């Protein structure tokens, strides 16, 4: 391909063809050679913005590769699509909806969309009123006791985002009139509820039913179970449901029908996708944990990235760079799996959150025009807290046969702020933080440079099974500190990365039709498992055989 391309002027050859040519030309190129050839490579391939640093120097890229990636973005009209996203255009083409999660973090004084801003802040203010009442011990259950446990019942975006943020910001938990604990329940099999309910008192427990449609069977089955638990203990009175449930949904009428009091109904909108909804009242558990000021800082961090994304040239635009690096790795270097490796235990749920954000958004095979995609779309996204992952799957990263790209994430500072309750252990804890940071840097270095990172004397007689190929690309994201503002920034970076990649692949990142049909088929099978129907003739042999075992008609 490269020879034929050289016959034509560069401007007449598509960026995709140019990138394929660069792959062929640099097929043997190793990351260590890129660093050897460019002494100031870190300065040339890193970006500092606000409270974070993005280092992408350990990718298998050159200036020529970046130029063609930027050209590709321009041919796909990325600037136009960014403008469309930050308008009220219906960029969700299959559902004919806008995608305005960015509006959820607009400052109250924002003048460009006054009605939209007012709509959002009206609901946020209603949420803040409930948060203040609960924190002050003024919100009471049906028997008059103060609420001390809040259980969020949701699934997908109504669970993953709030749980991830609540856990990540545990250091910023606010003091309340009485100790307040926040819990999360999502699984439809009831196992989480079974484990949790025996630890709680009905009199002092409040449940949040968090469901955009207020029709998700996973969530409503759990909600019905806890309703029965409450009514068994406190009696079947309207005030039990009205005092012990808060609903968050687009469907006010369904919440009312279920029995939730109007003052306990918090609304969101169809233009908010579930996996983009933690900034809305779906984030109620977050606000309960870190307080109103903390929640507003989370929104402010995300809004700062929204502004950066809209107003920064591609060369310094972190979400654009993250996205284009992913395109290069996935579509040109054939690296089809991506590991997210935070070196901070508080980010325990971050990889799981990104799995939904990235794979549910961009796990598509049909373009916006209905044609099959021309390039592979979303890679497999996975990961774990880095220090734990070192003892689990880093063997594969270092010496396996799979090419894997990685994101390393770490805070620069920890254990040095006044609000930490464990400040008396600060010195030992700071040493532990430095231990985590040293491992983060060591692993990214070894993945990139391989044997080059080893001592030459050690390498001289090292058996091959102890050697390292390296050349595994990675980015490193350093946060000044993991706090509400910086976490808001981090999440928004990945949201916009996803959008940029969807533009390059020409797919809709705001629908999820792939998950719908499975739910419908489950509805068809449920009557058979419940004994209300026994005709299995329409089913495949495997499903028939499994159902017979489940019903005890044959031995398993």
UniProtKB/Swiss-Prot annotation:
Residue positions of the active site: 360, 391, 519
Q: Where in the cell is it found?
A: Cytoplasm
PROSITE patterns linked: P_GLUCOSE_ISOMERASE_1, P_GLUCOSE_ISOMERASE_2, P_GLUCOSE_ISOMERASE_3
Q: What Enzyme Commission number(s) apply to this enzyme?
A: 5.3.1.9
List, in alphabetical order, the GO biological process terms annotated in this UniProt record.
gluconeogenesis; glucose 6-phosphate metabolic process; glycolytic process
Annotated pathway: Carbohydrate biosynthesis; gluconeogenesis; Carbohydrate degradation; glycolysis; D-glyceraldehyde 3-phosphate and glycerone phosphate from D-glucose: step 2/4
The membrane spanning regions, by residue number, are none
Family the UniProt entry places it in:
Belongs to the GPI family.
- Fetch the PANTHER family from UniProt: GLUCOSE-6-PHOSPHATE ISOMERASE
What name appears for this protein in its UniProt entry?
A: Glucose-6-phosphate isomerase
The organism named in the record is Acinetobacter baumannii (strain SDF)
